[in-house]
């Protein structure tokens, strides 16, 4: 599982993990971005939520993850990026994984010391990827929500599992991935 504020490099590293280890990258942000473009009531609701920079409600997020975990491609493992974001989601994920006879092997906490660095990265990504929903106001709101609701989950996982690994995410992509890979290879050796 990858945890950290938006713009900390989770998506980039998740793609590298997915490719290297042959496990699916489950990015809730991507799932929501796809769904909000659909001409449905749910799509319009998601678009409004996302454009405000708010978090999607726990119930909907849990249903999305539950349906995604049911696919057979997650049996060898998976990379969770952007979920859980609240304590209710973390507790629901624990229940879902227990029901599948699985657990979270490791939680990578992506750390970026400077909020301005995150804002700069996200604005650059918005321009490169044409993300109209990544306005400075929406980005600041999502960073605030991360600090309020999601950052405390790192302590939850540290206290309940002791498997949190801090990653200094301001380094070059290759250095960050080398550190992640070393940890993951160590886990595979213990299985």
Indicate where each model-derived feature is located.
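Glycine-rich phosphate-binding loop of ATP-dependent small-molecule kinases
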Residues: 1-191
């Amino acid at each position: 599982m990858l945890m950290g504020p938006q713009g900390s490099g989770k998506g980039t590293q998740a793609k590298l993990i997915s490719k290297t280890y042959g496990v699916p990258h489950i990015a809730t942000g991507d799932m929501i971005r796809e769904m909000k473009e659909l001409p449905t009531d749910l799509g319009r609701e998601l678009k409004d939520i996302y454009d405000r920079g708010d978090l999607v409600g726990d119930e909907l997020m849990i249903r999305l993850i539950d349906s995604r975990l049911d696919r057979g491609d997650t049996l060898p493992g998976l990379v969770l990026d952007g979920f859980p974001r609240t304590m209710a989601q973390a507790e629901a994920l624990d229940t879902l994984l227990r029901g599948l006879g699985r657990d979270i092997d490791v939680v990578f906490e992506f750390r970026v010391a400077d909020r301005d660095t995150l804002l700069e990265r996200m604005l650059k990504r918005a321009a490169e990827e044409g993300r109209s929903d990544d306005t400075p106001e929406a980005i600041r709101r999502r960073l605030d929500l991360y600090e309020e609701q999601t950052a405390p989950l790192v302590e939850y996982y540290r206290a309940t599992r002791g498997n949190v690994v801090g990653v200094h995410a301001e380094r070059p992509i290759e250095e960050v991935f080398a550190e992640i890979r070393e940890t993951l290879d160590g886990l595979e050796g213990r299985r």
